[in-house]
């Protein structure tokens, strides 16, 4: 008699995002638009970079479906697209992908959903082990009465969801 042991270790694709810092050039308060508008100057593009591991075969295929989206706890109340730059300022930020505003998942209230920045189907062939997603940040005025000079900062998390 003999013992036979079989092990199955499935390869599961994972993609880890790099940190991304987008720093906008300063803008004079006099050049900010009216409430409800994004500034048309000093926008800046950055690239979300995903580094993928465990791709299948020589064609670098993914083993499962992936979806990339952003989430934040710095969203303006009742908005899923405007990031507050500071609690006491009427200027924040808006992020865009392919020319359209990005809907971020609200970490404290996830009911409104989010924009999928990138979807990769299972068995997709990646030309490289990295995936790049361009994103543009702009100043956005949400309350003209509270606009003042000063530093602004907002944070969003890059999420990769697998199915």
Regions of interest found by a model, annotated:
Residues 1-163:
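Mature extracellular/passenger domains of Gram-negative fimbrial/pilin and adhesin proteins
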């Amino acid at each position: 008699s003999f013992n036979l042991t079989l092990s199955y270790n499935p390869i599961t694709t994972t993609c880890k995002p790099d940190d991304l810092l987008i720093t906008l050039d300063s803008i004079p308060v006099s050049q900010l638009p009216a409430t409800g508008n994004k500034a048309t100057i000093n926008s800046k593009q950055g690239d979300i970079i995903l580094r993928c591991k465990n791709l299948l075969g020589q064609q670098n295929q993914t083993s499962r479906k992936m979806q990339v989206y952003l989430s934040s706890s710095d969203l303006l109340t009742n908005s899923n697209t405007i990031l507050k730059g500071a609690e006491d300022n009427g200027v924040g930020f808006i992020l865009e992908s392919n020319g359209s505003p990005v809907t971020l998942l609200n970490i404290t209230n996830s009911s409104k959903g989010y924009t999928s920045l990138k979807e990769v189907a299972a068995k997709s062939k990646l030309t490289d082990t990295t995936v790049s997603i361009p994103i543009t940040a702009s100043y956005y005025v949400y309350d003209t009465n509270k606009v003042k000079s000063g530093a602004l900062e907002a944070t969003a998390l890059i999420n990769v969801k697998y199915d």
